[in-house]
Amino acid sequence: MIESNLLVLTLVIPILTAILLIFIGKRPIIKRHVALVGTLLTLVIALINLKNVLRDGPIKVELGSWKAPYSIVFVVDIFSALLIITSIIITILVILYSYRSIGLDRERHYYYFSIMFMLIGIIGSFTTGDIFNLFVFFEVFLMSSYCLLVIGTTKIQLQETIKYILVNVVSSSFFVMGVAVLYSVVGTLNLAHISERLSQLSVHDSGLVNIVFILFIFVFATKAGVFPMYVWLPGAYYAPPVAIITFFGALLTKVGVYAIARTLSLFFNNTVSFSHYVILFLALLTIIFGCIGAIAYYDTKKIILYNIMIAVGVILVGIAMMNESGMTGAIYYTLHDMLVKASLFLLIGVMYKITKTTDLRHFGGLIKGYPILGWTFFIAALSLAGIPPFSGFYGKFYIVRATFEKGFYLSGIIVLLSSLIVLYSVIRIFLKGFFGEVEGYTLSKKVNVKYLTTIAVASTVITVIFGLSADTLFPIIKDGAETFVDPSQYIHSVLGGK
């Protein structure tokens, strides 16, 4: 009972914090502290939830007097618990970074309120136990992201927000259609119950299940930034300030990735024969087009944005394998990418603060005045590229091993080659931005970026610690992967009256 209450608190605390932020009015200093304290409290509860999951297995809470599958159910397993903790840590870093970067005008209005509601949507997506509430929480974080995108009302923000809204309105419409078709087939919305019902379906209904799979893949691939539905991502994520880009780039695409992993495991693993091949094909194309984008641009933000696509593709390769090695690598690499992308965006934000540009052709030589910033970026770049002993190596190792275990050798080779492209793209930023010389550009009077650099360094230190803790984390992550490869434990925890 206590464990169930704690699970709900990860949603209740951000909701209460958001409500309190409304009543505070236009007092940014107080808003900062309220948002930070609320997020820290949520982190404490999330850590306790992880401890309970490791001890007891997946935990659930049923709202109302009904039992599953008829009640509204929230479930936390190892993967969702780790995702929640990582999301909250990144939210804390973004809030702290925003103190000196986002501007008082944005802080006075609904900036922190939107961040809290976006966190609610993300946590809800990771914990909901039914497919319709997954749609609801998707809409919660999407509505919040619309607000964050438009705060500041610059021309580029308004342009990209309109595109972003249109894409997501279409995507959400297809989501509702998919839920409706699925309900017409199985007569339930509970994820675990849907899994049971789908396993009992006759061949006559397989065509409808295939339609549901196609609809869901379109929706979740759009959220995750998968080829060819990624076209909205580079523009929408480029437009807002760096603190908001960090929040979006590190977290939002991972909700789509999680939804693909969960529905493939529970719904389509054994009912749609071509599901793995579709996901693998899209994953490889995402990696390839992400690599092209990463080396085509000189803009530091664009380079890292296209690296998001590469990472999503790599994770989906592991998910498509749906074996222990693949899911272990996918889970670890997802957490790694969330942390390292946050670090890189925060570091690029500091570089922009100094140079007032993100174009590598217009600045250089930063290492002379900002050596800590430069070498921190170098460490984050090595981690992103998967150079051992940093965290990117371990996840990719397991994913590549999974492809070889399944006989998908070309897929494994593409993942390995993508590491070289990633390394080239980020080392190019390091060499040109910190050691390069641009004609006509001289480093101006030193800008005070100590506070922002401290937050960015702290984020990178967390990433390094995550990599160095791989031996401790992998037994936990392997247990989390088993829940996806064999979802019976998840199903039993929801429907078995635990």
UniProtKB/Swiss-Prot annotation:
GO molecular function: antiporter activity; NADH dehydrogenase (ubiquinone) activity
This protein's GO CC annotations: plasma membrane
Coiled coil: none
Transmembrane segments: 5-25, 34-54, 72-92, 109-129, 131-151, 174-194, 211-231, 232-252, 277-297, 303-323, 331-351, 370-390, 407-427, 457-477
Top-level taxon of the source organism: Bacteria
Keywords, comma-separated and alphabetical: Antiport, Cell membrane, Hydrogen ion transport, Ion transport, Membrane, Sodium, Sodium transport, Transmembrane, Transmembrane helix, Transport
Subcellular location: Cell membrane
Gene Ontology biological process terms in this record: ATP synthesis coupled electron transport; sodium ion transport
Pfam family, one: Proton_antipo_M
Similarity-based family: Belongs to the CPA3 antiporters (TC 2.A.63) subunit D family.
Record's subunit section: May form a heterooligomeric complex that consists of seven subunits: mnhA1, mnhB1, mnhC1, mnhD1, mnhE1, mnhF1 and mnhG1.
PANTHER family referenced in this protein's UniProt entry, alphabetically: NA(+)_H(+) ANTIPORTER SUBUNIT D1 (PTHR42703:SF1), NADH DEHYDROGENASE (PTHR42703)
Function of the protein: Mnh complex is a Na(+)/H(+) antiporter involved in Na(+) excretion.
Protein's recorded name: Na(+)/H(+) antiporter subunit D1
Source organism per UniProt: Staphylococcus epidermidis (strain ATCC 35984 / DSM 28319 / BCRC 17069 / CCUG 31568 / BM 3577 / RP62A)
